[in-house]
Swiss-Prot record:
This is Adenylate kinase. Belongs to the adenylate kinase family. One of its GO terms (biological process) is AMP salvage. Monomer. ATP binds at residues 12-17, 129, 138-139, 201. The lineage of its organism: Bacteria, Bacillati, Bacillota, Clostridia, Eubacteriales. Keywords: ATP-binding, Cytoplasm, Kinase, Metal-binding, Nucleotide biosynthesis, Nucleotide-binding, Transferase, Zinc. It comes from Clostridium perfringens (strain 13 / Type A). Residues 128-165 are annotated as: LID. Coiled coil: none annotated. Residues 32-61 are annotated as: NMP. Pathway: Purine metabolism; AMP biosynthesis via salvage pathway; AMP from ADP: step 1/1. InterPro entries: Adenyl_kin_sub, Adenylat/UMP-CMP_kin, Adenylat_kinase_CS, Adenylate_kinase_lid-dom, P-loop_NTPase. AMP binds at residues 33, 38, 59-61, 87-90, 94, 162, 173. The gene is adk.
């Protein structure tokens, strides 16, 4: 039975890791809006050309362009047995457009899967990340610190905190997520399509919780 999933969750919730595991377990494509944009732009599709013209002018790509890209992607053969949408929909307008498109095809989303993680937990998780600028090795000052304080275990370079991981930046991203996504969460809750998973668990436990929701008979 096909399984169609919308994946929701704040930055730092581990969506990418879980998306990969879900895709493998259920043999469905992991569809991210970033990948769709890059593919359309690199292949110079009409939608890609239109999107690029907005981006080149420093403008936001209109919802309709994004929606049409997603519609095209969902009609490809590898989506016949379901798919995992990551990064779409971002707004209630996009969710309604997706609903209308699926209704026309006599289909619907099976679940909107929310990986829920408290803000304090994400702040600790993201602001503690460190990376080696020389070899790319990743660390965490609490959960996976380098053996020698501040030095990469592999090459000895000083590890750094990326700009994206500073407390100010993380808080800004979380505020944007909250303001943008709460109406979307309410939308799926009202449609009784929302499933919530505790994202503070260990990675394998989060995945086990997801499988219980989706059914693990694949």
């Amino acid at each position: 039975m096909p399984v169609k999933i919308v994946l929701l969750g704040p930055p730092g919730a581990g969506k990418g890791t879980q998306a990969k595991s879900i895709s493998n377990r259920y043999s469905i494509p992991h569809i991210s809006t970033g990948d769709i944009f890059r593919k359309n732009i690199s292949e110079n599709t009409p939608l890609g050309i239109e999107a690029k013209s907005y981006m080149d002018n420093g403008q936001l790509v209109p919802d309709e362009v994004t929606i049409n890209m997603v519609k095209d992607r969902l009609q490809q053969d590898d989506c016949k047995n379901g798919y995992l949408l990551d990064g779409f929909p971002r707004t209630v307008h996009q969710a309604e457009a997706l609903d209308n498109f699926l209704t026309e095809r006599e289909e619907s989303i099976d679940t909107a899967l929310l990986i829920e993680v408290p803000k304090e937990f994400i702040l600790e998780r993201m602001t503690g990340r460190r990376v080696c600028p020389s070899c790319g090795a990743s660390y965490h000052i609490k959960f996976n610190p380098p053996t020698n304080d501040g030095k990469c275990d592999l090459c000895g370079s000083d590890v750094i905190q990326r700009k994206d991981d500073t407390e100010e930046t993380v808080k800004e991203r979380l505020d944007v997520y909250e303001n943008q996504t709460q109406p979307l969460i309410d939308f799926y809750k009202n449609k009784k399509q929302l499933s919530v998973v505790d994202g503070t668990q260990a990675i394998n436990e989060v995945f086990e919780s997801i499988c219980k929701i989706l059914g693990s008979d694949k």
